[in-house]
Amino acid sequence: MYILTIGSHSSLQILHGAKKEGFKTALVTPEKRVKFYKQFTFIDEVYGYKNEDEAVDYINDFANNGILIPHGSLVEYIGPERVNKIKTKIFGNRNLFEWEANQKKKMSLLKSAKIKIPEQFENPEDIDRLVIIKLPGAKGGKGYFIARNKSEAKEGLNKLLEQKMIRSIDEVIIQEYVIGVPMYFQFFNSIILNRLEIMGIDIRYETNIDGLRRLPADIKIDPTLVVVGNIPAVARESLLPLVYEYGENFVNTVKELVPPGMIGPFCLESVVTDQGDIVVFEFSGRIVAGTNLYVNGSPYSWLYWDEPMSVGRRISREIKLAINSNKLEQVLT
């Protein structure tokens, strides 16, 4: 049995964990990255593709002896339409990819889960506070911008249209910009063990907004929000019960709205305010790149497993547990 994934995002962690759990490993990656990935001895086979259709062909070569692990690059670059052509079984719920590609559906799901979310504005004319405008898909913050009022919001939206980053204003989501500390809560929902695990917390490091603090206040540069890295974090323990409650609510709602439900890793991307409120502004329905911080396990995964347990390894551990209990079909779609 092969564990395979796309060469990007969190692929090193995923395949490192798969090898630790005794699986063969394979990677499908753009041709220009083949040399880089071949240096890692835990990757058994590396396939370079010229275009996304060829990537799907390589993935489908493993239809009878492989399991594909999805991550953000599969969602964003291979795309939901091509994912529908993938015959190889996918770990997790592939039906969730369509929801993740649509910002409005994502927020609707969070609202249904009774999770606190930022105020949203359907019409730029209604903006009366600081807002952030987000593009669809898993773009790592590319194209996102902050606006202080409706005038700045409309100006920024017109630029996105001119640059063809969006086709319609209906594609974006306009959210209140919540002031606080960003915290991205990483979970794993185990179908086999019937439990939800908090796997870690990270903070995204974004350019250029995180570099602007080093400049004098009188230098005016428009901030951008492109994710380039991640910083580890732990939360006040008193926050964790609410974090866990939100995770449970999310799992229950996905089971109801997106059958067969939440399988494996996901992330609730949040801001913690000075009042201790946790406001969730987005979710990822698969492994997130912030888990790369914890290849040797996080402060939280150690509490569940008492051994090094990355999210990548946790995925393969779940697959192994499913195989051993004859429940593999319950964790694949």
From Swiss-Prot:
Signal peptide: none annotated. ATP binds at residues 124-184, 206. Binds 1 Mg(2+) or Mn(2+) ion per subunit. One of its GO terms (molecular function) is magnesium ion binding. The keyword Nucleotide-binding applies. InterPro entries: ATP-grasp, ATP_grasp_subdomain_1, IMP_biosynth_PurP, IMP_biosynth_PurP_C, IMP_biosynth_PurP_N, PreATP-grasp_dom_sf. It holds the Pfam family DUF1297. The keyword Metal-binding applies. Catalyzes the ATP- and formate-dependent formylation of 5-aminoimidazole-4-carboxamide-1-beta-d-ribofuranosyl 5'-monophosphate (AICAR) to 5-formaminoimidazole-4-carboxamide-1-beta-d-ribofuranosyl 5'-monophosphate (FAICAR) in the absence of folates. Residues 94-324 form the ATP-grasp domain. It comes from Sulfurisphaera tokodaii (strain DSM 16993 / JCM 10545 / NBRC 100140 / 7). NCBIfam families: PRK13278.1-1. The lineage of its organism: Archaea, Thermoproteota, Thermoprotei, Sulfolobales, Sulfolobaceae. Its EC number is 6.3.4.23. Belongs to the phosphohexose mutase family. Its cofactor is Mg(2+); Mn(2+). Keywords: ATP-binding, Ligase, Magnesium, Manganese, Metal-binding, Nucleotide-binding, Purine biosynthesis. Transmembrane segments: none annotated. This is 5-formaminoimidazole-4-carboxamide-1-(beta)-D-ribofuranosyl 5'-monophosphate synthetase. Pathway: Purine metabolism; IMP biosynthesis via de novo pathway; 5-formamido-1-(5-phospho-D-ribosyl)imidazole-4-carboxamide from 5-amino-1-(5-phospho-D-ribosyl)imidazole-4-carboxamide (formate route): step 1/1. GO terms for biological process: 'de novo' IMP biosynthetic process. Mg(2+) binds at E269, E282. 5-amino-1-(5-phospho-beta-D-ribosyl)imidazole-4-carboxamide binds at H9, S73, N230. It catalyses: 5-amino-1-(5-phospho-beta-D-ribosyl)imidazole-4-carboxamide + formate + ATP = 5-formamido-1-(5-phospho-D-ribosyl)imidazole-4-carboxamide + ADP + phosphate.
